[in-house]
C-alpha cells in the first residue's frame, strides 16, 4: 500500500540497542511488518543523519521494533521516525546495468543518479504455481566441463564451492559474458557479507574484461548489489533480496533469461542469525535462528523459471569448518540442482576452469533429460578419470611401465580428457593471450566421444590443452609435430 507524503505517520525512538530501534507511534498509526522507516535529523555535531530501518516486530503499547540498514551512530532517543507506508523499494530495469548499489538501491559508484522511474518492493511473493515453467531444460553455458558433467538447469540453483585463488571470480565473469552473448540475457551480482576488497576487485576486473562497459554504461551486462562484511546485519540480511528483485524485473517484465550470483549464501544465513538474536528470539540448532528454513525458502522459491523467462542462480557456498551437516549449508543443499566444485589440485596443474569433474554433480544428468548420448558420454568420461585417479598411487611408486597395456591406454586417454576439459575464456584473454571459446554441447560430446573411442590416440596430449572444440585440437597437434 502506497501512502502519500502528507499522510505519512511519524513516531519517536524510545530505545536503541546497536542496530535495533524501538519506535513509538500514535494509536491507529502503526506501520506494518516490513515497512521501511526513515530516521532523519541532526547528530550532536550538527551533521545530517538519515537511517532507513525495516519493521520486524509489533511489540504492543503502540511500539514497533525495527532493524537498521545502516550504522546507527548519532541516533538518539526522541528522534522523529517517518513511516514510508511500504516496504523498501529499489530501482529496477536496464538503467541498473553497469552500476553498483547498496541494499537500499542507492548507487554507490559516484556515477550520478539512476535514470529509471521503475521501482519494486524487495518483499514479493514467489511466482504462482500456474506461472511456473515445469519443463526440465538444460541451460547451456558454453563451458565444456560444466555442460558435459554437471549441467545447469534453466531456472535452477547451482552451488559453487571453492577456496581462495582457484578461479571462482573468473568462472563467474565468463558465465556473465556467455549468457549475454549466447542467450541475450543479463546478470545480477549480489555480494552478501563478503570482503569489500573482493567486491572492488570484481568491479575492476569486470571493467577490464568488458563485462561492464565504461565508455557506454548501457552496453554493460551486469548490475552489482553489495552489502559487505562491515555493514550492519540488517543490510546483509536484505541485500540478497535487493539483487533478486532486480533480477525478477528482467525475468517478468523484460522476459529475459537472467543469471543471479549470490556470494555468499552462508552470509545471508549468518546475518539472519544475528538479527534473530538481536530481536530476542530463542536460538535453534547450533545457535541458528528458528526461522532458518523459512528465510532460506523465501529467497530460494523466488528463484525459478516462469513461462516468461528464467532466473538461474549460482550461489557461492561457504561451509563452516568443512562441516556439511552444519544447518546453514545443509539447508542450502536442499534447494540446489547442481554443484560446481573447484579443485586446487587442478588449478596447480594449470588446468582452467579448475572444475573437479568427479566431485561436481547435477540432478539434470539423467538419460531421460539430457538424452542417452550425452549421459553415456559423461559416464564414460567419469569412469576413465576415476580409473586414472585409482592408478595414480601405483604410477607414483612404480612408474607407468609397470601398468598393463590396457591401463596405460586408459591413463593416456584420461590425461587427454583432463586437458580437453580446460578451455580459454573470453574474460581471461587479457591475461592468457588466447582468444576465448564458446563450445556448444554437441561439439563437446563429439570431442569426448572421439577421445574415448581411441581415434585420437596418436595425437599428443598437449594438443588438447586450452582449446575449444576438437578441430582446434587437431590443428594444434599439426603445429606441435
Swiss-Prot record:
GO BP term (any one): proton motive force-driven mitochondrial ATP synthesis
Record SUPFAM superfamilies: C-terminal domain of alpha and beta subunits of F1 ATP synthase, N-terminal domain of alpha and beta subunits of F1 ATP synthase, P-loop containing nucleoside triphosphate hydrolases
Alphabetized UniProt keyword annotations: ATP synthesis, ATP-binding, CF(1), Chloroplast, Hydrogen ion transport, Ion transport, Membrane, Nucleotide-binding, Plastid, Thylakoid, Translocase, Transport
Membrane topology of the entry: Peripheral membrane protein
Location in or out of the cell: Plastid, Chloroplast thylakoid membrane
Record CDD domains: ATP-synt_F1_beta_C, ATP-synt_F1_beta_N, F1-ATPase_beta_CD
EC number(s) from the headed UniProt entry: 7.1.2.2
Any one GO molecular function term: ATP hydrolysis activity
Reactions catalysed according to its record: ATP + H2O + 4 H(+)(in) = ADP + phosphate + 5 H(+)(out)
GO cellular component: chloroplast thylakoid membrane; mitochondrion; proton-transporting ATP synthase complex
PROSITE patterns: ATPASE_ALPHA_BETA
UniProt main location, coarse: plastid
Residues in the signal sequence: none
Binding site for ATP: 162-169
Subunit and partners: F-type ATPases have 2 components, CF(1) - the catalytic core - and CF(0) - the membrane proton channel. CF(1) has five subunits: alpha(3), beta(3), gamma(1), delta(1), epsilon(1). CF(0) has four main subunits: a(1), b(1), b'(1) and c(9-12).
Function per UniProt: Produces ATP from ADP in the presence of a proton gradient across the membrane. The catalytic sites are hosted primarily by the beta subunits.
Family from the record: Belongs to the ATPase alpha/beta chains family.
HAMAP family in the cross-refs: ATP_synth_beta_bact (MF_01347)
Name of this chain's protein: ATP synthase subunit beta, chloroplastic
UniProt organism field: Chlorella vulgaris
UniProt lineage: Eukaryota, Viridiplantae, Chlorophyta, core chlorophytes, Trebouxiophyceae
